[in-house]
Amino acid sequence: MAIILGIDPGSRVTGYGVIRQVGRQLSYLGSGCIRTKVDDLPSRLKLIYAGVTEIITQFQPDYFAIEQVFMAKNADSALKLGQARGVAIVAAVNQELPVFEYAARQVKQTVVGMGSAEKSQVQHMVRTLLKLPANPQADAADALAIAITHCHVSQNAMQMSESRLNLTRGRLR
């Protein structure tokens, strides 16, 4: 069993999603958004750090998965996003959580089956995979999708390791 915290970083709205993985089964534990309604960036970063720390304390995750920064057309926006990611990662590292990063395209490919999927498609698939009664908010759905991606990637890596181990023992299943 593992608990995974997924984070969709943003300087104004940071989505979070928490799921539990038992074997191949995924279950929803919680999700939401950290909203920073102050204007100055240092205060927003402080709120993101405090919010992520509180979520970690509440859910006690085993793994922390976060979206990688993509190349934005606006350099200022990309820098702010990078800073928001940075404080979220520091919050995880301060709690001694292993940090995993996933590209947005990889997340969409894993959850929807198409790397260019729309936000509404991600929301729908997250709802379906986690058997939720309604679509989660867009930022929370993205965070849940990041957590789901971590489960799939880590499960595939484990299966590959087992296959390699069996090959070194002279057996292939």
UniProtKB/Swiss-Prot annotation:
Is Isomerase set as a keyword in this record?
A: no
Cofactor note, please? Binds 2 Mg(2+) ion per subunit.
- Which InterPro entries does this entry report, sorted A to Z? RNaseH-like_sf, RNaseH_sf, X-over_junc_endoDNase_Mg_BS, X-over_junc_endoDNase_RuvC
**Entry GO terms, CC:** cytoplasm; Holliday junction resolvase complex
Report the subcellular localization.
Cytoplasm
Q: What is the reaction catalyzed? A: Endonucleolytic cleavage at a junction such as a reciprocal single-stranded crossover between two homologous DNA duplexes (Holliday junction)
What is the uppermost EC class here? hydrolase
What EC number(s) would the UniProt record show?
A: 3.1.21.10
Q: Where is the active site?
A: D8, E67, D139
Q: Please give one Gene Ontology molecular function term for this protein.
A: DNA binding
SUPFAM superfamilies in the cross-refs: Ribonuclease H-like (SSF53098)
Q: Where does Mg(2+) 1 bind?
A: D8, D139
Presence of the UniProt keyword Cytoplasm in the record: yes
Which HAMAP family has this protein been placed in?
RuvC (MF_00034)
Q: What does this protein do?
A: The RuvA-RuvB-RuvC complex processes Holliday junction (HJ) DNA during genetic recombination and DNA repair. Endonuclease that resolves HJ intermediates. Cleaves cruciform DNA by making single-stranded nicks across the HJ at symmetrical positions within the homologous arms, yielding a 5'-phosphate and a 3'-hydroxyl group; requires a central core of homology in the junction. The consensus cleavage sequence is 5'-(A/T)TT(C/G)-3'. Cleavage occurs on the 3'-side of the TT dinucleotide at the point of strand exchange.
What interactions and quaternary structure are annotated? Homodimer which binds Holliday junction (HJ) DNA. The HJ becomes 2-fold symmetrical on binding to RuvC with unstacked arms; it has a different conformation from HJ DNA in complex with RuvA. In the full resolvosome a probable DNA-RuvA(4)-RuvB(12)-RuvC(2) complex forms which resolves the HJ.
| Name used for this protein in its record | Crossover junction endodeoxyribonuclease RuvC
Q: Organism source for this protein?
A: Shigella flexneri
- In the UniProt record, the gene name given for this protein reads ruvC
